[in-house]
């Protein structure tokens, strides 16, 4: 059975990563969403709730992890963050492995990983796709979000690898500063090329 070509998908805040992930799904490409996996693990009756509650008492409830409370406990505390990651990361890795097994005959699978470069998650990937748009487009998109401020946006950017560096480290760059149709055309061409090189097995 053919092993899929494994593509990482990433990009800074406001660059259109979610839109590109949706395009890929609509083209029949299996996409593993790392953020969604974490939400599932930490949501109502999530399998990680007992371990998180034991490590950080008072941060979980019937609806799952109390994200603000847990965030306050680990923000600025490197040791606490390491303890949380030691609980979460192995569980996400197991979900990734199950996803790969499920889609082993596919020509292409994509792992949607927001902090791919920041957390060093690129080791098991065949290539990385970065979504990018001009800085002013990014700024307009992000500041249009409910509750977003210039200060919050600046803080988030300070924690992320700069867009220019992501572009330089990418194997493929998708320009999302264009129309949706033009962006979709770029994605479709890339998917077609990979499927031709790595047919379904």
From Swiss-Prot:
A GO term, aspect molecular function: dephospho-CoA kinase activity
Annotated PROSITE patterns: DPCK (PS51219)
Pathway named in the protein's UniProt entry: Cofactor biosynthesis; coenzyme A biosynthesis; CoA from (R)-pantothenate: step 5/5
GO cellular component, one term: cytoplasm
Keywords: ATP-binding, Coenzyme A biosynthesis, Cytoplasm, Kinase, Nucleotide-binding, Transferase
One Pfam family it belongs to: CoaE
Annotated GO biological process: coenzyme A biosynthetic process
Annotated EC: 2.7.1.24
Catalytic activity: 3'-dephospho-CoA + ATP = ADP + CoA + H(+)
Superkingdom, natural source: Bacteria
Enzyme class: transferase
List of residues binding ATP: 14-19
SUPFAM superfamilies found in the cross-reference section: P-loop containing nucleoside triphosphate hydrolases (SSF52540)
Keyword Disulfide bond included in the entry's annotation: no
All residue ranges annotated as the DPCK domain in the record: 6-201
UniProt entry tagged with the keyword Electron transport: no
Subcellular location: Cytoplasm
Predominant place of localization: cytoplasm
NCBIfam families named among the record's database cross-references: dephospho-CoA kinase
General function of this protein: Catalyzes the phosphorylation of the 3'-hydroxyl group of dephosphocoenzyme A to form coenzyme A.
Family from the record: Belongs to the CoaE family.
Protein name stated in the entry: Dephospho-CoA kinase
Organism expressing this protein natively: Novosphingobium aromaticivorans (strain ATCC 700278 / DSM 12444 / CCUG 56034 / CIP 105152 / NBRC 16084 / F199)
Gene name, Swiss-Prot/TrEMBL: coaE
